[in-house]
Structures are given as structure tokens and as C-alpha cells.
Amino acid sequence: MESTEQKLELITKYFADFTSTQLVQLTGLEAAYKEWNSQINVVSRKDIDQLYLHHVLHSLSIAAIAEWEKGTQVIDIGCGGGFPCVPMAIFFPEVQFLAVDSIAKKLKVVDAVCEMVGIKNITTKHTRVEDIKNKKFDYAISRAVAPLKDLWKWAGPIINKKPNQPNGLICLKGGDLHQEIFESGVRPKMMSIYDIFQEEYFKEKFIIQVKK
């Protein structure tokens, strides 16, 4: 069985510039999620041993295209157990993340994992994203949460539009998305994750970006 350090090489072969603090945080994710997943199931039991490939690296595909400055405000819509926001918060320690989910026990896992590995830049909120009215964000992110039409309906009103900035929605999706994109009424940019990470798992997985 591979050690956590060996599994982490899957991440570091694509991202070589992590600080020692970030590497410690990434290494700690496996133990933290295994401990909490045994109490509150946020990652399928058969998937937990593939945490770094299926969840951490998948989440970090957003980091491969994002150039976020210090102070950028990001909302994770339907964050579940913390993907993509937890790996992204490690990658961007000076970016502020709001992790939103309608299921409180999932946010309990996010809070616990953040405390265990020392993530300071995620705030959780037990609510539905459509009920957030008085706060604006630079970006919304999500992974396998809802159809693109709904995601943009929720995200569009709370995204700041800035000149010469690609502010908007970035979501991770898989499979044949042509009908979903057609029904969304928006014109997103669609990128193959397999073009970024040459792992078989990503062959039919995509980054969908909608600019405000």
C-alpha cells in the first residue's frame, strides 16, 4: 500500500512550488478525512483511498487555470465535505473562501479538517446559496453540484464584475455536457482536465468557466 507521501507525489509532480507549510497541510488531509469520514460520510468509502487523485488533484485543476490575487473572495457552492474549497484554500492561503452547504453535518467535517491541518482562510455557512443576498464574491466554484443553468442562476447575482478580470463561475463537471450547456443559456469556456493532468481518471472531466 502506498504511503501518504507517495500519494502526495501525484500532486507535487504537477505543482512544484508548495511551501513546507502547504506540504504539511496536504499530507494531513488523508488522516483528517479518514477520521471524519468514519463518522460522517462525505467521501464514498471505496473512494477514500483515492483521496489525492479523485478529490485533491481534481479540485486543484481550478488552481491550474486561476490567477487569484491576495484578498480575492471565493464562494464554494454546495461544498459538501470540502471539495474543491479545502485543496484550493491550501493552494491560495491569501484568498478568502466561503464554503456553503445546506447540510450542516458536512460543514462540520470541513471545519474539523481545517482545524486539524491548519487552514485559516475558509469560513463555513449553513445556508442555501440562493439565500445569500448581501455579499459579493469575485469567483464561485463548485464540483458536481447542480446543472450549469442553476449554478449560474445562483452565482451570477453575487459575482462582482470587474474590468479586465475573468470574474465568474468555475465548476468541475464530467461526461457529455453538450445538452447541459445548451440548456444553460450561457456560453462557457470548456477545458479538458486531461489536458492538464495526464491521469486516466480525468479523461472525461472538464472545467467549465462562465465569466460575469
What are the roles of these predicted feature ranges?
Residues 163-176:
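Conserved beta-strand signature within the Rossmann-like core of class I S-adenosyl-L-methionine
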Residues 1-70, 75, 105-120:
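Class I SAM-dependent transferase core
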Residues 111, 152-156, 182-183:
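Short amphipathic alpha-helical segments
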Residues 60-142:
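Conserved SAM/SAH cofactor-binding pocket of Class I
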Residues 139-152, 156-157:
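A short SAM/SAH-binding and catalytic strip from SAM-dependent methyltransferases
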Residues 176-212:
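Active-site capping/gating segments
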Residues 66, 159-163:
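A generic alpha-to-beta junction signature in SAM-dependent methyltransferases
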Residues 96, 121-123, 168, 189-192:
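Conserved beta-strand segments of alpha/beta enzyme cores
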